[in-house]
A protein has these predicted regions:
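A short, N-terminal "cap"/entry segment at the start of jelly-roll beta-barrel domains
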Residues: 1-42
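Conserved hydrophobic/aromatic beta-strand scaffold that supports enzyme active sites
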Residues: 32, 40-44, 60, 77, ...
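Conserved short histidine dyad/triad with adjacent acidic residue
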Residues: 36-55, 89-92
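Short, conserved beta-strand element in jelly-roll/cupin
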Residues: 45, 54-70
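Short histidine-centered beta-strand/loop micro-motifs
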Residues: 50-55, 71-72, 97-98
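Short acidic-glycine-tyrosine-enriched beta hairpin
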Residues: 74-91
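Ligand-binding loop in jelly-roll beta-barrel domains
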Residues: 90-111
Length: 111
């Protein structure tokens, strides 16, 4: 966040509208806060969610509720459950998300 100045603020997620994103199977619901150089999202993947694309973007991801499988293009997989996080840089480890039971994530990345 070098050079980005963000004054103290709170986020009341109940006041942030949700957008719906259809994927290969299931739906992703996003609540997004966009700041200069920073995107903060509360993301809910429905039961049976399978991302329709491989993502090359870097993120900080924290699992608030549920379980998600993060599949990397090299075939490896990492499972996040409530209270776990992962971090990844842009263009370093192409990945996608899959969940059978549904999950709620807090995702922070660049714009």
């Amino acid at each position: 966040m070098t050079g980005t100045k963000i004054p103290f603020q709170t986020i009341d997620w109940s006041n942030i509208s949700r957008t719906e994103h259809q994927d290969q199977t299931g739906v992703a619901y996003w609540q997004t806060i966009q700041l200069e150089g920073l995107r903060i999202r509360m993301v809910e993947y429905s039961k049976g969610y399978f991302a329709d694309h491989w993502c090359e973007k870097g993120h900080i991801v924290h699992c608030l509720q549920g379980k998600v499988v993060n599949e990397l293009k090299d075939g490896s997989k990492a499972i996040l459950t409530s209270g776990m996080s992962y971090v990844i840089s842009d263009d370093l480890s192409t990945h996608r998300s899959i969940t059978d039971e549904g999950v709620i994530l807090l995702i922070i990345d660049g714009d």
